[in-house]
Amino acid sequence: MYFQDIIQNLNKFWSEEGCLIMQPYDTEKGAGTMNPHTFLRAIGPEPWSVAYAEPCRRPTDGRFGDNPNRAQHYFQYQVIIKPSPDEIQEKYLTSLEFLGINPKDHDIRFVEDNWESPTLGAWGVGWEVWLDGMEVTQFTYFQQCGGIDCNPIPIEITYGLERIAMFLQDKESIWDLNWNKDINYSDIWLQFEKNQCSFNFSNSNPENMRKLFAIYQEEANSLIEKDLTYPALDFVLKCSHCFNLLDARGVISVTDRAQYIEKIRKLAREVATSWIKERELMNFPLVKK
């Protein structure tokens, strides 16, 4: 199954399960959880079901395309359902069957692995899903986002698209994956990966990154004061990416790291609080009356 067909099939499956099918969010982020369709919608009383593919950037993970299964840019497929439905594990296994992976023919294990994002003030309990010894999915019942308790509890299912594609296509390297019948993953992303790694590790200007972080932090604070939740979150995500770029350059001390994380977490918490306040003023419109 081609890479693009995996996304299309997951869209079809989760659409039939009642999920909105959304598009990626248009700013750099380290995980699909940072998309407002997850980070904001996971909190508050309103029900929410959404699925989407999300490109993610983690600058420190770059290897100039030399590592067969590690890159600074990759794709997740994100599913959020709130409240979490019964038999969600069975639905997930059925989604694998929809991709051509019969659970009866493979060793599929749910390995306990609780999840945490310090910068988002988010955590949850759940499992890694292993398929014949390779992790392919993270399964998490969110407990908090932005430091706010989740009630009702949402389920997050995060598929690692490259790993699933490697399994389906029997490939040893993400760079050999077939995006479609004519174009490989490397034809699209290898030059991008090399360029971005050069920037991440050698050519970004740390002093400018520090200045940008301060500017983005100031902008986020200003927007939070005005209860402009969405643009405020945009600037929190920009702060997070600046921090990740500084980390990739190796210019952050242990003390600085803790301070940067706390600054981002504080902003994320205030954005989440602002979101709840906005939705409450709207009488939580998605709650069924």
Curated annotation (Swiss-Prot):
Biological processes, Gene Ontology terms: glycyl-tRNA aminoacylation
Top-rank taxon: Bacteria
Gene name linked to the record: glyQ
Known EC number: 6.1.1.14
Catalytic activity, reaction form: tRNA(Gly) + glycine + ATP = glycyl-tRNA(Gly) + AMP + diphosphate
Keyword entries, A-Z: Aminoacyl-tRNA synthetase, ATP-binding, Cytoplasm, Ligase, Nucleotide-binding, Protein biosynthesis
Localisation per UniProt entry: Cytoplasm
Family matches, as Gene3D superfamilies: Bira Bifunctional Protein, Domain 2 (3.30.930.10), Class II aaRS and biotin synthetases, domain 2 (1.20.58.180)
Main location: cytoplasm
Family annotation (SUPFAM superfamilies): Class II aaRS and biotin synthetases
Source organism of this protein record: Prochlorococcus marinus subsp. pastoris (strain CCMP1986 / NIES-2087 / MED4)
Database matches in Pfam families: tRNA-synt_2e
Family: Belongs to the class-II aminoacyl-tRNA synthetase family.
GO molecular function, one term: ATP binding
Keyword ATP-binding on entry: yes
Alphabetized HAMAP family for the sequence: Gly_tRNA_synth_alpha
UniProt name for this protein: Glycine--tRNA ligase alpha subunit
Subunit note: Tetramer of two alpha and two beta subunits.
PROSITE patterns found in the cross-reference section: AA_TRNA_LIGASE_II_GLYAB (PS50861)
GO cellular component, one term: cytosol
